[in-house]
Amino acid sequence: MSPDPTGESPSLDRASDGARSGGRPGLTPWGNRASDEAPALLGNWLSMVEGRLSRCWHLTLCLDYDGTLAPIVAEPDAAAMPADVERALRALADRPRVDPAVVSGRALSDLRERIDPDVTLAGNHGLEIARGDSEWVHPGAAERREALERAMADVAERLASYPDCRVADKGATATVHHRGADADHATVRAAVDAAVADEPGLVATNGRKVVEVRPDVDRDKGDAVRELVDDRHSAAAVYVGDDVTDEDAFAALDELACESMGVLVGRRRSAADYRVHDVDGVRAFLEWLHDAAVPATGGGR
């Protein structure tokens, strides 16, 4: 069932989150960026969001994969979009006024196996981008490939006594998973930091139950979002994500010369403007976008 644009859908709950005055231009009626509170529930503001988006001739819709389009699972290879989420994303991809993109920490090759080919892909936190037959890889990723291999071999040795920790080679980057492992995050991070210290040109960052290792280049999900929006000269941009690495994308929305909105999946302090509860809330939001907020045709620049 498609969500009610009044916001009374069970997946896009209304709540007593209060509006705050002031704020940046765009879809939000307040300045959530500096708040200590979690973003407001999106269901409280659907009527306003619909009014803004329905006037925009083109929307770039960017979404994380794990925890956003697909539930978090113990084994990352088993993560998959629920059928109803996949249908909702495909339906939006069929709209000429919508350009959906998945912006993920997963490798581009991994995303290709999971996502409809009509959807733009930004892998490894934006170090790789594929749109149709076009593919781009950040030059810094190739330059630091051997250093990354050495560092990950070092990490694997340091964590050998924790068999449930897994090092995933993603080509341009690597991820050390410790969900369900005996090793806590501090132990894993210490092992990664020690390995990275011996390899100039690499940097470690935290994710949800993971530590990411990547080339030390000025590139993150926010850069990917800016480029995707600018390439299409979009009139509106929406980013949906759950991870701490998605905060770069939420922050980048402020720099865009168009309507913009960040949607957090879950509840925590965030630079996002709104939130939904979970992957099913994302599904409801995608269906609502298709049915209520994004006309199938029309519009102009």
What role is predicted for each listed range?
Residues M1-Y65, L69-A70, D84, D230, ...:
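Non-catalytic pre-domain segments flanking phosphatase-related domains
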Residues A80-A168:
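Active-site phosphate-binding/coordination module
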Residues I115-D118, P200, L256-C258, A271:
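Short, structured coil segments at secondary-structure junctions
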Residues N124, D133-E146, T205-S234:
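Substrate-recognition "cap/lid" segment bordering the active-site pocket of phosphatases
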Residues A151, V155, T187-A197:
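Short amphipathic alpha-helices in soluble, non-transmembrane regions
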Residues A172-H178, V210-P215:
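A generic structural motif
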